[in-house]
């Protein structure tokens, strides 16, 4: 059996597949001439941040999630493509906007997040939209807490976790 599992492991297409939020973090970036805070739009979302770092380390990764078919969603899609993350299961929703987060950084480096997702596209991912072949063909399946905050995406996430486990895929959870 160990030989079979090791062979199966070798044949996996991806090192890590992550499911969850892909959003825009607006981070403080100085003051305007009028003294108002300036904010910079940065790609964010813990599951995809993990994938981006793994890509830099030479790992093969893929993302499963949903963004709005809007300026920010397209920016996020372009960004994951540029860093080499497989985005074949990134879904663009024409009815719901991409989730936004305002990030306040305190003097000690700690951060506070205010999410604008009422709902956000990431919350609307459905089980039938998940390419389970990605879940089956990875060594590690990773997900985070935000994909557990709304019933629809929670059910989709649970289905992906169960599929991963049934295929002997290691499941990783970020309680972030």
For the regions a language model picked out, list residue spans one by one.
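Solvent-exposed alpha-helices and their adjacent loops that cap or buttress functional pockets
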Residues: 31, 94-95, 105-107, 133-135
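Ribokinase/PfkB-type carbohydrate-kinase core domain
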Residues: 10-18, 81, 107-176
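N-terminal amphipathic/basic-hydrophobic helices that include classical n-h-c signal peptides
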Residues: 1-11
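A short, structured active-site edge motif that brings together acidic residues
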Residues: 89-98
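Glycine-rich phosphate/adenosyl-contacting loop at the front of the ribokinase-like
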Residues: 9-86
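Short beta-strand scaffold segments in enzyme catalytic cores
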Residues: 100-104
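Acidic, glycine-rich active-site loops and adjacent beta-strand->loop/helix elements
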Residues: 66-72, 96, 119-121
């Amino acid at each position: 059996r160990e030989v079979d599992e090791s062979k199966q492991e070798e044949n996996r297409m991806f090192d890590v597949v992550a499911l969850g939020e892909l959003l825009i973090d607006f981070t403080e970036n100085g003051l305007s001439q009028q003294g108002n805070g300036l904010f910079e739009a940065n790609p964010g979302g813990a599951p995809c941040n993990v994938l981006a770092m793994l890509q830099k380390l030479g790992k093969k990764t893929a993302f499963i999630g949903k963004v709005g078919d809007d300026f920010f969603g397209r920016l996020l899609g372009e960004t994951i493509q540029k860093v080499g993350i497989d985005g074949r299961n990134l879904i663009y929703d024409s009815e719901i906007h991409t989730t936004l987060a305002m990030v306040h950084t305190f003097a000690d480096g700690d951060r506070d997040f205010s999410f604008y997702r009422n709902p956000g596209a990431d919350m609307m991912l459905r089980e039938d939209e998940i390419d389970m072949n990605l879940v089956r063909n990875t060594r590690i399946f990773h997900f985070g807490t935000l994909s557990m905050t709304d019933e629809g995406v929670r059910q989709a996430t649970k289905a992906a976790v169960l599929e991963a486990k049934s295929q002997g895929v290691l499941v990783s959870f970020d309680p972030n």
